[in-house]
Swiss-Prot record:
Enzyme class per UniProt: lyase
Family annotation (HAMAP family): IGPS_B
InterPro entries, sorted: Aldolase_TIM (IPR013785), Indole-3-glycerol_P_synth (IPR045186), Indole-3-glycerol_P_synth_dom (IPR013798), Indole-3-GlycerolPSynthase_CS (IPR001468), RibuloseP-bd_barrel (IPR011060)
Family that this chain belongs to: Belongs to the TrpC family.
EC number(s) on file: 4.1.1.48
Pathway given in the UniProt record: Amino-acid biosynthesis; L-tryptophan biosynthesis; L-tryptophan from chorismate: step 4/5
PANTHER family hit by this protein: INDOLE-3-GLYCEROL-PHOSPHATE SYNTHASE, TRYPTOPHAN BIOSYNTHESIS PROTEIN
Protein name per the record: Indole-3-glycerol phosphate synthase
GO molecular function, one term: phosphoribosylanthranilate isomerase activity
UniProt entry tagged with the keyword Lipid metabolism: no
Annotated keywords: Amino-acid biosynthesis, Aromatic amino acid biosynthesis, Decarboxylase, Lyase, Tryptophan biosynthesis
Originating species: Thermoanaerobacter sp. (strain X514)
Reaction catalysed by this enzyme: 1-(2-carboxyphenylamino)-1-deoxy-D-ribulose 5-phosphate + H(+) = (1S,2R)-1-C-(indol-3-yl)glycerol 3-phosphate + CO2 + H2O
Length: 260
């Protein structure tokens, strides 16, 4: 399975990082407290949009050939996108840790670090890179979720906790997670079904911030998800395909938010 392969590779990568810079050194570099900016933009009136910076994926291969993270961030800065998700996973998504630093220089939007967090080391690293939030995936962490969630909060990060089914949702709720991301993509098969959000949202308490991820292709999809009670959507591939046309992406966002 692709997910198992990603996790195996990620664990090796983190061990190499620890060898170069031990976790104790990393912890000493942490500065700044909790801004809460990521959670704030998801909770504002109307549906919020998280625009993703993503060059590739295991299911689609290269999505954006002439990839420039700074150029993409500048587009997101100009249109009514509320937060930016930055893919930092190198091997399978062609991401890079430095993209967060680069984006931070040109954008005022809160940044979500999108990666496969398998070690506490990556949480400290995310804070130092300048992320406002991290993604924690229940199918990757299992019973480690609570500890990783609490550590993330303690260093001043918001946490988007990703689930795909009812069992994973229960684990997230038991850990006290306040931002739940429903991934419409099954990470085991990479099949996508936007109805996953509709099927799971009814089991999520009302005081939880809900994000729908994957398979969101049109403004109509976003308005449909908003009607279900979703607070925010995360859009990657759809935006990457039109990112060079600022008018097109601006119109898409306006229409999705009901102003088009």
């Amino acid at each position: 399975m692709v997910l198992d392969e990603i996790v195996r590779h990620k664990k090796k990568e983190v061990e190499e990082k620890k060898r170069i810079k031990p976790v104790e050194e990393l912890i000493n570099e942490i500065k700044g407290g909790y801004s809460g900016n990521f959670k704030k933009v998801l909770q504002k009136e109307g549906i919020s949009i998280i625009g993703e910076i993503k060059q590739a994926s295991p299911s689609k291969g290269i999505i954006k050939e002439d990839f420039d993270s700074v150029k993409i961030a500048k587009v997101y800065e100009k249109v009514d996108v509320d937060a930016i998700s930055v893919l930092t996973e190198k091997e399978f998504f062609k991401g890079d840790d430095n993209y967060i630093r680069e984006v931070k220089k040109v954008s005022s939007k809160p940044i979500l670090r999108k990666d496969f967090i398998v070690d506490e080391y990556q949480i400290y690293e995310s804070k130092i890179l300048g992320a406002d939030a991290v993604l924690l995936i229940v199918s990757v962490l299992g019973d480690k979720l609570r500890d990783f969630y609490n550590l993330s909060k303690s260093v001043g990060l918001d946490v988007l906790v990703e689930i795909h089914d009812r069992q994973q949702l229960e684990i997230a709720l038991e850990a006290g997670c306040d931002i739940i991301g429903i991934n419409n993509r099954d990470l085991k098969t990479f099949n996508v079904d936007i109805n996953t959000t509709e099927n799971l949202i009814k089991y999520i308490p009302q005081n939880t911030t809900i994000v729908s991820e994957s398979g969101i292709k049109t403004p109509e999809d976003i308005r449909y998800l908003a009607s279900l009670g979703v607070d925010a959507v995360l859009i990657g591939e759809t935006f990457m395909k039109i990112i060079d046309d600022i008018d097109k992406i601006s119109d898409f966002v306006k229409e999705a938010k009901g102003g088009g």
